[in-house]
Amino acid sequence: MIIDAIEAAFTRAKKQGWEKTYWLFDLHDTVITSNYGVGEVEEYFPFALETLKILSDREDIVLILFTSSHDEKIKVYMEKFKNLGINFNYINENPEATNSSYANFDVKFYFNVLFDDKAGFHPMKDWEPVYQYLIEYYGK
């Protein structure tokens, strides 16, 4: 479950003394419904925006948009998120994690938590528990 990944990320960060964790978010069928190019109507899944807002407000969490959308659509999405008070730090990259003696991030960039329907995230089931966990974890 996604909560296990979140708890593992927080635990690892605390143990290692890391100041940040890196969270990837696919867009279609994860944050918003897919319309497969038919029309412009896309809907946010319940609790997605509320959860993203909590995460966006945290200095210890880096949000990365992980999408195969075309650049012009990404600009539209980023503007929409910005207007909602949700700020993704990066798009399809994590320049903060650099190569080291034990890891090469030239092709696969570093992240701690992945929200993607292709990776088992179920937006209709998983957003609310994540939201509730963060409310409890952060005391909001």
Residue ranges and their predicted role:
Residues 1-140:
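HAD-like aspartate-dependent phosphatase fold
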